[in-house]
A protein has these predicted regions:
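Alpha-helical DNA-recognition elements
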Residues: 252-253, 305-306, 317
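Well-ordered mid-protein domain cores that form the structural environment of catalytic cofactors
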Residues: 55-57, 63-109
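ATP/adenylate-binding site constellation spanning eukaryotic-like Ser/Thr protein kinases
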Residues: 116, 264-267, 308
């Protein structure tokens, strides 16, 4: 095996997460947007492996989370579908356990998890992945279709890759560079078998139905109008889509209609703003009005039901300024 020049020593860090903002902060350099979509206090764990040539992570959360965004690095993300994450919707589609999800750097990470989900992922540099799969690189990384793909390897190949990935995430800290390279190479070798065994090109499933474009466009409008009034008819008029069709697509993808999704986006952003404003002069009322919440009593009840605490508690004040 060719020796790799080390820019940084390999490392592994484990985190216990007691707040959704901890989760958001941990992955903020990735550049995605995160929303807690189920009700209750958030808790979870995360393991981040920064290796010699690859990266890996494991995230376990008790609440459902919607994630949308694009990694800024030129990395290919590979995620095994297991019993712990098979109820996750990947780009609007559920995959059965035994599949391998592959997402190239040009493709958005776009998924909706359920409660108590565990996701493990291996991130491989694009040039390295391209060398591994050869002429299949274009379709596997989504550069031809701008969508993720799923492939179903043999059961034995999949188990070996999962074991190698778990071994990588269970490495002791500090990680010895030579042992790290050995574990990484084993993981890459097992991944290569998963990707290339048999008629690989015939086992590839592209993810991303036409309805995904409509969801993307709708979410973009919501983000643009996040601090302004927005009605369902505004979205339908701009996208020239029937309200019933839009509601059905959102129900299938998120379990709720578009306007409930929009309100949840604003609720999550409000919580982020309240956390950021701790120790300052801003009040709950000021921040709530910024995101269009005018009935503060109703907001307090909805907020507590969703996050398990009052807005004033998130802001860090002993006595509420609006709910009393």
């Amino acid at each position: 095996m060719e020796k790799t020049a080390l820019l940084y020593p390999p490392s592994i860090n484990a985190y216990k997460l007691t707040d959704f903002e901890h989760f958001r902060y941990l992955f903020e350099t990735w550049g995605g947007r995160f929303q807690q979509t189920s009700r209750g206090r958030f808790s979870g764990t995360a393991v981040i492996y920064q290796g010699v040539r690859v990266r890996a992570f494991q995230a376990e959360t008790n609440q459902a989370i919607f994630t949308r965004g694009q990694d800024k690095a030129e990395m290919v993300t590979v995620i095994p579908i297991t019993k712990h994450n098979e109820s996750t919707s990947w780009r609007g589609r559920e995959l059965t356990r035994g599949h391998l999800l592959v997402k190239g750097p040009d493709v958005e990470y776009y998924n909706q998890t359920s409660r108590n989900t565990v996701i493990q992922a291996l991130l491989v540099p694009l040039h390295m992945f391209t060398q591994m799969v050869g002429p299949l690189a274009g379709i596997m990384t989504g550069r031809k279709s701008l969508t993720s793909i799923a492939i179903q390897p043999s059961g034995g190949a999949m188990r070996r890759f999962q074991d190698s990935l778990e071994a990588l995430l269970a490495s002791p800290d500090p990680v010895h560079p030579d042992k790290a390279e050995f574990r990484e190479q084993k993981c890459l070798d097992d991944l290569s078998v998963c990707l290339l065994s048999g008629d690989a090109d015939k086992r590839i499933k592209e993810l991303g139905a036409k309805r995904l474009r409509l969801i993307d466009q709708t979410l973009d409008i919501m983000n643009e109008r996040i601090q302004k009034e927005l009605k369902a008819e505004d979205i339908c008029a701009k996208l020239q889509v029937n309200d019933r069709v839009l509601r059905r697509i959102f129900k299938q993808s998120f379990g709720m209609g578009p306007m409930a999704t929009y309100r949840l986006m604003r609720l999550n952003l409000l919580r982020h703003e309240l956390k950021s404003a701790r120790g300052g002069d801003l009040t709950v009322a000021t921040l709530a009005q910024r995101y269009g919440f005018r009935r503060l009593g109703a907001l307090a009840e909805e907020y507590q039901n969703h996050f398990g605490e009052l807005p004033s508690e998130t802001l860090g004040v002993r006595k509420t300024r609006v709910e009393a």
